[in-house]
Amino acid sequence: PIKDSGKSVLGFGARRVYDDDRLPAKYVNTPETPVYKKSHVLYGLDLARANIGKKSQAVIVEGYTDVMAAHLSGIDTAVAACGTAFGDDHARLIQRLMGNSGSLNGEVIFTFDGDAAGQKAALKVFRGDNQFSSQTYVAVEPTGLDPCDLLMQRGPEAVRELVARRIPLYRYVMENTVSQFDLDRADGRVAAIRAAAPLVTSIRDQSLVDGYLRELSQVVGTDVDLVRREVSHTRRQHRSEPQLTIVPPPEPQQG
């Protein structure tokens, strides 16, 4: 059952258990109804709401069984979107529950696979990261196992370790961007900076820009002044264009 924060049932969802199950999507769920608006619902919120507020932490996982696995492993702030991507309305809901009033007094942790789809999902979150006044992190399992599979194969400690190994979202995005280039070559470093520059120019909170510049210079291994010049050049080039265009990962199929 999919419940709201008041524990009223809004719909139902399930996960495909076996690869040969006759279901085209990994997750299936109730279509939208007048009372079930997927962009306003987070699975597991009835269990996690109080702890999200108490701990100023929210762990965003992919699906229903990941929420179950996280809670069984002691991660009692885990929730998931239902049949849709995590969006702006979900972010505002989390922010309200955490009680943020503009200071960095909490953390939102997204779990992603380490594959290309996971990287695209991280980029999509980065684009909307300024919605959160909390600090945003990414927890990635290199083997590609989700929390449910981790629990079944390695036990609850592995799920807790996944969350504990979280890294800042901006670092994950920048490292994945520059990893496509040969940083042992001068032209490779310049190309990496130019590829990552739109990430910096997309930041709406200008008080964060200097820290991002320094982080990028450390990741690439070059002088921060060079990074600053390239970012300024990119900003001038794209001043009249959208700040950052990212192709989002495919939306989960709805049942």
Which role does the model predict for each range below?
Residues P1-L104, A122:
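Phosphate-handling DNA/RNA-contact segment within nucleic-acid enzymes
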Residues S5, R49-Q57, L72, G87-G255:
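A charged alpha-helical hairpin associated with nucleic-acid processing machineries
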